[in-house]
């Protein structure tokens, strides 16, 4: 009997993550019957619901920005530390085997999930409808959408913003309603969610190098035969490499596409970046005071 695998995501057809999931499906569809809902927000469901739906087996496989998992695994806040990593390679290098093992074990032992891999969720930058965000003074009073993550909320508040934490579903609605002055996201989301229609000032802040968790329901995975598990595991490894390469290619192309949408792009100077880093330092220290085993 052919096993059915139910897959879901939260982004549109052209996004890196949806293209990546389609690659995963291509690799496994000779062995499984697949159903794939590309974007659950089109059905008025919040992106964050993917976690619970995958935990309870309503769906089998999904992906989601690591920030949405921090209430389950506080160690994941390491990947969200603002202005902490030198660059994307530094972030990937510090996502080492020790940290991966901690996350894998907690997902498996406490949350009914098996980690299939980490995806590149893109370098996060800040956009605004009012001005470039070159210094903390530029943040003052602006309503910014953040993810529903306490570290993000506290960080942007400390910069001077008025944080408005929103799931992807509500973020899209807030953009349409004109409820936001600013937002922070990787370029793929800035483009796919058409942020450029209302926010014409994009500042390359590179404040967070984001990751997605690629997951499968534990019960589903453990119900598979040895051969089926190997297919899922090997296909996941291939998919993870495919995703990182695709994400890098897209990031290089997106700036050109965004500029064509009449968006002005500026890059924060190293001197001004230090001002944000100085404010962020207290969040780094607070995290490592609780998780000093991750200070590497």
Predicted segment positions?
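A gly/proline- and charged-residue-enriched helix-loop-helix capping module
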Residues: 86-110
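N-terminal secretory/targeting leader peptides
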Residues: 1-88, 108-109, 113-296
């Amino acid at each position: 009997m052919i096993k059915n695998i139910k897959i879901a995501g939260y982004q549109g057809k052209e996004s890196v993550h949806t293209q990546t999931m389609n690659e995963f499906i291509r690799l496994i569809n000779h062995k499984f019957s697949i159903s794939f809902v590309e974007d659950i927000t089109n059905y008025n469901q919040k992106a964050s619901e993917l976690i619970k739906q995958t935990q309870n087996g309503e769906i089998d496989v999904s992906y989601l920005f690591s920030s949405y998992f921090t209430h389950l695994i506080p160690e994941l806040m390491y990947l969200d530390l603002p202005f902490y990593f030198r660059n994307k390679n530094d972030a990937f290098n510090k996502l080492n085997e020790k940290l991966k093992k901690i996350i894998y074990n907690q997902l498996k032992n406490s949350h009914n999930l098996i980690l299939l891999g980490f995806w590149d969720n893109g370098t996060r930058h800040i956009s605004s409808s009012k001005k470039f965000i070159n210094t903390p003074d530029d943040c003052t009073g602006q309503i910014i959408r953040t993810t529903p993550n306490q570290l993000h909320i506290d960080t942007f508040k400390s910069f001077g913003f008025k944080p408005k934490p929103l799931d992807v579903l509500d973020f899209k609605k807030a953009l349409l309603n004109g409820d936001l002055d600013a937002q922070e996201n990787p370029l793929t989301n800035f483009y796919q969610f058409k942020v450029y229609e209302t926010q014409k000032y994009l500042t390359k802040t590179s404040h967070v190098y984001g990751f997605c968790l690629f997951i499968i329901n534990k019960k589903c995975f453990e119900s598979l035969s040895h051969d089926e598990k190997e297919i899922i595991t090997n296909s996941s490894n291939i998919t993870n490499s495919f995703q990182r390469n695709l994400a890098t290619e897209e990031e290089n192309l997106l700036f050109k596409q965004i500029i064509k949408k009449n968006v002005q792009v500026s890059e924060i100077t190293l001197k001004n970046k230090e001002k944000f880093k100085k404010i962020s330092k207290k969040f780094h220290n607070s995290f490592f005071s609780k998780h000093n085993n991750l200070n590497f």
